[in-house]
From Swiss-Prot:
Family listed: Belongs to the eukaryotic ribosomal protein eS32 family.
Organism: Thermococcus kodakarensis (strain ATCC BAA-918 / JCM 12380 / KOD1) (Pyrococcus kodakaraensis (strain KOD1))
Keyword field: Ribonucleoprotein, Ribosomal protein
Subunit structure: Part of the small ribosomal subunit.
Keyword Oxidoreductase: no
Signal peptide: none
Other known facts: Initially thought to be part of the large ribosomal subunit. Crystal structures show eS32/eL41 to be a small ribosomal subunit forming a bridge at the interface of the 2 subunits.
Annotated function: Interacts with N(4)-acetylcytidine (ac(4)C) 1459 of the small rRNA; the acetyl group of ac(4)C1459 briges the interaction with this protein.
Designated name of the protein: Small ribosomal subunit protein eS32
CC terms in the record's Gene Ontology section: ribonucleoprotein complex; ribosome
Length: 37
């Protein structure tokens, strides 16, 4: 494994948080669709 710079670690964490937010939004949209059907 190659050593990663500290800057990359911070960016990785931000990206992970952003991905989690997207997943939550998708789940909320699906719940709304189920309620309408």
């Amino acid at each position: 494994m190659k050593r990663r710079p500290r800057k990359w670690k911070k960016k990785g964490r931000m990206r992970w948080k952003w991905i989690k937010k997207r997943i939550r939004r998708l789940k909320r949209q699906r719940r709304k669709e189920r309620g309408l059907i």
